[in-house]
Each structure stands twice: as C-alpha cells, then as structure tokens.
Amino acid sequence: MSLASPVGALTRTKITACVSAANTAAATSAWTAAGAYEGEVAVEISVGIITGTLDLTFNTNDAASDTGATAIVPLGGALAQVTTANDDAIYTAVFPATALRGYIKVIGTVGTGPSLIAYTLIGRKKY
C-alpha cells in the first residue's frame, strides 16, 4: 500500500480523549469542526467495559453552539444501544460530509455509569 492510497489520505481528529464517563455530561463531546471534509465522514466510537447502558446520538450545527443544532442520523440508521452484552468494541457512525453543517457533536447518554469511551472523527479533507 502506498502513501497515495485512499487510507493514507484520511485525517483523524480526536473528538474526546478516552474518558470514564459516569454521566451523560461526561459522555457528550464538545463541538468539533467538520466543515473541511468531503465524501463521507466517520465518527469512530471506542467503547471499553461499561456497567450499564450507553446510547449514542449526534447533532450538527453551523456554529459551535447548541442553539439551532439539529439531530443527524448516521447512514444505515441509529447505532444500537451499547450494553454489558456488546461493550468492549469499536462502533462507527458514517455521515455524508454535505449533511454536516460545519460542526458535529456526539451525545452519549449514560444509563448507570460509568462508560469507558473515546470518539474520533475520520475523513478526507477537501484541501
């Protein structure tokens, strides 16, 4: 595989560092700039061992603000709820870059924490 391959052209941006999230506030990311991407953009969700449940949803906005934000559903539909039966895994949510309004936010709703999680944005930049 050469560095000119499609995989070599991908950019990875850390949305959150690995965190033990005891509640929804701790499992929800800040707004991350996503306007410089083309094609499809993926959010990779790394989940360690959890003690309850974790529901993942996504918002997009044209500013890094909750005001005016709208929910966005990944291609293929919403992600399945993470439980103790399917934790310790990597999940991927894929979005058309054109559907993102410039920023993306991951909302992790924790039902009985903690949940060990990390989020990464992966895509090809336009420039």
Language-model segment annotations:
Residues 1-127:
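Surface-exposed, low-hydrophobicity beta-strand/loop segments enriched in small/polar/acidic residues
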